[in-house]
Amino acid sequence: MWSTPSGPVFRRFVGAVATGVSLAATSGCTVPADAVAGISKTADGRLLGVMMVCGHQIDGATLSVASDDVDKQVTVGSWTADRPLTPGLATWTLDSPAAGWTATRSLAPLTAKTTYALYGWTKDNSWSANSISFTLADRDRLTPGKVRYDSISDNGGESAITVSIAEFKAKACQNM
């Protein structure tokens, strides 16, 4: 014999299931970060990618037009390290081949009033690097020996800061 659940009990059950399905659908899988991406400049003004690997490895980096909509992100450059980057600091020029790097997509011309994001990744999506967003105006304010990156505070907040390379090496992996 079948029994019909009472209205309030049934509604609570349906509400709980709907909430669970909603949470599962909206909680995207993210790749854990274990590195920090930044930008710098060479003495002759060329844009540098800077990567501080904190504990595991990073295989490459991509520069894209920053967008909250994944479908609107356009890759403007991508590089693969000849060997996985292990804990420590790595730099490479973005506009031309650099020793130890292969351009899998050569850098396209960057344009004013566009925000770009540089991030690091692994081939198997096991690790990533926190990205840095920047504009050409941000790039133009950089001086050689300085790195712009997103610093993560003790409470988890992020803010773009510019520091010396030595300070970047010392502090970038804090709060990871």
What are these regions (language model features)?
Residues 24-28:
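C-terminal motif of bacterial Sec signal peptides marking the signal peptidase cleavage site
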Residues 30-36:
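Bacterial lipoprotein signal-peptidase II cleavage site
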Residues 48, 123-176:
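Extended, polar beta-sheet/loop recognition surfaces of beta-rich domains
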Residues 2-17:
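Bacterial N-terminal signal peptides that target proteins for export
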Residues 53, 120-122:
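A mature extracytoplasmic/lumenal domain signature
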Residues 36-84, 172-175:
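Short, surface-exposed binding/anchoring microloops in extracellular/periplasmic proteins
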Residues 112-119:
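A short tyrosine-centered beta-strand micro-motif
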Residues 22, 62-111, 123-145:
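Extended, well-structured beta-strand/loop surface patches
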